[in-house]
Amino acid sequence: MNFRQLRTLVHIGELGSLSKAADRLHVAQPALSRQIRALEDEIGTPLFTRHGRGMVLTQTGELLVERANNILRQVEEARADAISSGGWVRGSVVIGMPPTVADILAGRLAKEFADQHPDVNLRFVSAFTSHLIEGLQKRNIDLAILYDPKSHGSLHIKPLLQEDLFLVAPGKAKLSLKKPVSFKDLSAETLLLPGGQHSIRQLVEYHAREADCELKVTMEADSLSLLKNFVSLELGSTILPLPSVYQNIEEGSLSAAPIIDPSPTRTLVLATATDRAISNATQRAVEMIKQEVAEMIAKNIWVGLPL
């Protein structure tokens, strides 16, 4: 089993066609076919089911493709790090973020990388914490920002920020960032919240139980843009971190107020897989995320406590 065979396996598995893989790799079809046959002979089982419309991975083939992708990625990272040792950062980084963080941070981070490290290829994954953890464990994600993760032996965790949540209402409600709202007062609000698997919903409901406060949730949406749109249409109020709505508050379409007694807060962390070395490009992403978050805190765009 060699690097060339694994690369061929990955491309045929992705394209489902020997001819398409040959065109992509600029290698003759018979040569690719011999590589796959050699792999199958070595392993002792078919890696593809062959039919008139192409080639489909078997269960063994799918498993080997997953491992091969990790190997090929590590080889590329090693090459990029060797080049980067001369001071020029290059390579690729897959960064995972919860939706509320992605809307706040991804654009800023992408611009900074484009300006400072144009040879780094970034890919962003926006998903819930459970999916991001799975991506880290499977090595599909290099670095993730997570909310309040439970202890995971497979992850290396670095605290980033303790974030405050705010009541967000239409602009005409005239909520003020200088006039906090009591948590129990939320019982009088028509609330629009994310679904039950979202960390904001879980946190709000936890504090509601602790405060013996009954909330009136009339609509659910896991999309940040939908929640903001619904609030601007005066369908109700929601609960979000301040950076999510900072621009809307400046424009006057939304207003917000801190929540107290108790104050719902979430802890954000940076996470990487413990069984994987951090590439130079990934380490640079860690540094830039910390820098961007610190700048937003200093400008009162992101309200919270740096950790």
Residue ranges and their predicted role:
Residues 128-133, 137-141, 146-147, 197-255, ...:
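Hydrophobic hinge/microswitch elements
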Residues 90-153, 221:
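Central regulatory/effector-binding core of bacterial HTH transcription factors
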Residues 10-28:
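Short helix-boundary/capping micro-motifs
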